[in-house]
């Protein structure tokens, strides 16, 4: 049986500069830069539920993309994500994607 060995390095963000230069960097670098920017804009204000905010920003497009890729097959989507189907259904409902 074929075993797929993908690492997080496969998740990259590609950008094209005004000089048509193409760059790729790991998704985690973009997330880190976005968080630093967000925190810099707080100007000392207290923030709560940052963890949930970040998860929602990543989780919703992940679910949407995987559901499109699997053509709505929840069993296959759950397997791809490494979660059980019940958990997937709860997450889809949370984001109004059921």
UniProtKB/Swiss-Prot annotation:
Keywords: Activator, DNA-binding, Transcription, Transcription regulation. SUPFAM superfamilies: Homeodomain-like (SSF46689). Signal peptide: none annotated. Residues 74-93 bind DNA. Activates ribosomal RNA transcription. Plays a direct role in upstream activation of rRNA promoters. PANTHER family: DNA-BINDING PROTEIN FIS. This is DNA-binding protein Fis. The lineage of its organism: Bacteria, Pseudomonadati, Pseudomonadota, Gammaproteobacteria, Vibrionales.
């Amino acid at each position: 049986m074929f075993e797929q060995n993908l690492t997080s390095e496969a998740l990259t963000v590609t950008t094209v500069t005004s000089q048509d230069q193409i760059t790729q960097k790991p998704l985690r670098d973009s997330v880190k830069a976005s968080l630093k920017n967000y925190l810099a804009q707080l100007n000392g204000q207290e923030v709560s539920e940052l963890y949930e905010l970040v998860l929602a920003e990543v989780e919703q497009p992940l679910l949407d993309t995987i559901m499109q890729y699997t053509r709505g097959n929840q069993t296959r989507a759950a397997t791809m994500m490494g979660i059980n189907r019940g958990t997937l259904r709860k997450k889809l409902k949370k984001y109004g994607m059921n």
